[in-house]
Amino acid sequence: IPLRLVGSEMCIRDRNIKISGNECVLENGTQIDVGCDGKGFALDEVKKLLDSEKADCAVVSFGSSTLLYGQKPDKTDFKVAVTDPFDNDNTCLSFTSGGGSVSTSGGYERYFEAQGKKWSHIFDLTTGYPCETDLVSVTVIGQSGIETDFLSTCIFIGGSVELDRWLSDEDIEVIAINENGIVYCSDSIKSRISISDDKFRFE
């Protein structure tokens, strides 16, 4: 977990988990579920393998996390589609990228229903309950798979009220969609986004 991004005090609230510098000690049988950024970590390991083999180009996908590696034979950018969060059988937009890691988080594929309400599989660490957010989809593009995987989840939980800090972050590009179909994005990627459904629109 890239604790430098948020600070360990925001992530660790269990007395059985001790953090000192870069060392983490788990006590009394405590385990950590790496589901939040396991795919991103795996992508980074695949990238190391591709580097060692001097691969020219590859697209590796672990579901919601994808590695765009190298340069395509025709020298054009990669084109990435984002699932429509209101209709999973379709896409809502696409964008082009020269390469890197892409991760998307949302509550539209894995959720449960209780008390007449849909609850996301993504939990808010400050409450211990499924997160309640006005965002329905968050995509992050960057160079590190573990960071894009982790950050897409964090930004999704934080909602649109915390978007500005991420939209202005020069190390990543962000595309976020709220429950009304409004698309927020980093300035650097807006010209490379193509919206494919008229129920979505830029802020």
Identify the meaning behind each predicted range:
Residues 86, 107-121, 126:
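Pocket-lining segment of extracytoplasmic ligand-binding domains
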Residues 14, 55, 75-77, 90-92, ...:
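Extracytoplasmic
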Residues 71-108:
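Phosphate/pyrophosphate-binding betaalpha-module
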Residues 64, 119-175:
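Proteins synthesized as precursors that undergo proteolytic processing into mature forms
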Residues 179-203:
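Low-complexity, Gly/Ser/Thr/Pro-rich intrinsically disordered linker/tail segments
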Residues 19-86:
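RNase III-family endoribonuclease catalytic core
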Residues 1-7, 11-12:
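Single conserved hydrophobic/aromatic residue that forms the stacking wall/gate
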